[in-house]
Amino acid sequence: MQDLFSVAGKVALVTGGTRGIGLMIARGFAEAGAKVYVASRKQEACDATAAELSKRGTCIGFAADLGGEAGCRALAAKLAEAEPRLHVLVNNAGANWGAPLEEHPDAALDKLWNLNVKGPFHLTRALLPRLEAAVRPGDPARVINVGSIDGLHVPSLETWGYAPTKAALHHLTRMLARHLARRGITVNAIAPGPFESKMMAETLRRFGDSIRAGCPLGRIGEPEDMAGIAIYLASRAGAYVTGAVIPVDGGISTTL
């Protein structure tokens, strides 16, 4: 049983891994003994994160623009040069945008669909050879998509691109899970509620007290909460789970 939740020796790629949810997951993997690659748009941020996490484990950073297929293919090529196999892919890179309905720019919709939905699609497809190479009997390769509870319910804020793209990512997760199972790859999604991050900073500043009051567990998510669910899905403990969309929100989704 001591190895049930182990990810030691596994190779993981976490996109958007230099801050927020992605950094929480990357740090958890590194501290648990995985070899972690983080990807973000700026090489400086990747280098800083790699230096920090390498104090706890092994971490390498790659700059990547995942808002288009070419950037996803380029990242996959970098990873392929470095590793013969990839055990865990975490599609976390994403963006948000809020504006009144009458003012929401079309360019913002394009950006969010490209990064939040098409990015995970293109990157997963490009990395299939490395994921398949990691498959072992009883130990599938894992894809973990980071969605949102805003993709499970209708949010009160006018995030006209964000919430629909996260709902789409959840359904993409289910489709990939069905079709990749025969190739030894599980695909699941985490749907975070409120966590401390740059994306959530303004919302928590303005509404943090009311969010806590409305949360059945009475608090904001902590890094260990996010690392824990990712390690579960990436370990032997989660090997029989695929196609799941798991809220990690302190119970908020039960109240909506």
What are these regions (language model features)?
Residues 2-4, 153, 231, 242-256:
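Short C-terminal tail/terminal secondary-structure segment
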Residues 11, 18-19:
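Conserved glycine-rich cofactor-binding loop
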Residues 100-101, 105-113, 211:
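Substrate-binding pocket helix/loop in short-chain dehydrogenase/reductase
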Residues 124, 165, 173:
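Active-site helix of classical SDR
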Residues 129, 178-179, 239:
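Alpha-helical segment proximal to the catalytic Tyr-Lys
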Residues 148:
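Residue(s) in the substrate-gating loop at a strand-loop-helix junction
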Residues 181, 186, 241-243:
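Short, small/polar-rich loop/turn modules that mediate ligand/substrate recognition or access, typified
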